[in-house]
Amino acid sequence: MGNKINPTGLRLGITQEHRSKWFATSKTYPILLQEDYKIRNFIQKKYSSAGISDVLIARKADQLELELKTARPGVIVGRQGSGIEELRSGIQKTIGDRTRQVRINVVEVERVDADAYLLAEYIAQQLEKRVAFRRTIRMALQRAQRAGVLGLKIQVGGRLNGAEIARSEWTREGRVPLHTLRAEVDYALREANTTYGVLGIKVWVFKGEVLPKEEQTIPVGAIPRRKGSRKPQQFEDRSSNENS
């Protein structure tokens, strides 16, 4: 079953958290669910070059809280936070409610090459530039190994290198335990639009195991942070508190 099911959905509540945190009645649930879809779609299209890994949504009364995990926070924040105001107005327009309070927090991804979605996005960009898929996979593996991941699996399917018959090929380095529920496995799915058709890209990243009564992952054998390295940036939106 571990090889068939989505690794993120299998580990919800164990090592993975829900991407949307809110409760609603049976009448308002589909409306809020559609809002979440529109918000994520709008952000991914508007900031396709910002390297957004994930968008977490939380709702408290009439307030909407967003947490954007990105590799380039400066693209979203802008000069003196001007990009946040533009993003807030765009979200309000997308959901059709100009009076909705929207709070946005931008968090920089600490290890870009250890993030499954950013790795999949990198592979998709290289394939769209018509780089050979085997070379692209090898480069992605090297980047992930330098980031200190414990295991990585990459699968690419479609008309590889313009072949007439579609096929899928995969490669794995290290250990990727899909059946172990306490294993923190980051999973991502992306598509690359090439001249020969659409290629599907799947990436599994094994970061470590979460032991009982331990909240943080213990990555055995992972590469430690170098001394003097830059800490990840975080921009917290405080405009809603000041206005209220």
Curated annotation (Swiss-Prot):
Ranges of compositional bias, category Basic and acidic residues: 233-244
Domain KH type-2: 39-110
Pfam families assigned: KH_2, Ribosomal_S3_C
UniProt GO cellular component terms: cytosolic small ribosomal subunit
UniProt GO molecular function: mRNA binding; rRNA binding; structural constituent of ribosome
Keywords noted in UniProt: Ribonucleoprotein, Ribosomal protein, RNA-binding, rRNA-binding
Superkingdom of the organism of origin: Bacteria
Keyword Electron transport: no
Region (Disordered): 221-244
General function of this protein: Binds the lower part of the 30S subunit head. Binds mRNA in the 70S ribosome, positioning it for translation.
HAMAP family: Ribosomal_uS3_B
Subunit and partners: Part of the 30S ribosomal subunit. Forms a tight complex with proteins S10 and S14.
Protein name (Swiss-Prot/TrEMBL): Small ribosomal subunit protein uS3
Organism: Prochlorococcus marinus (strain MIT 9515)
Gene: rpsC
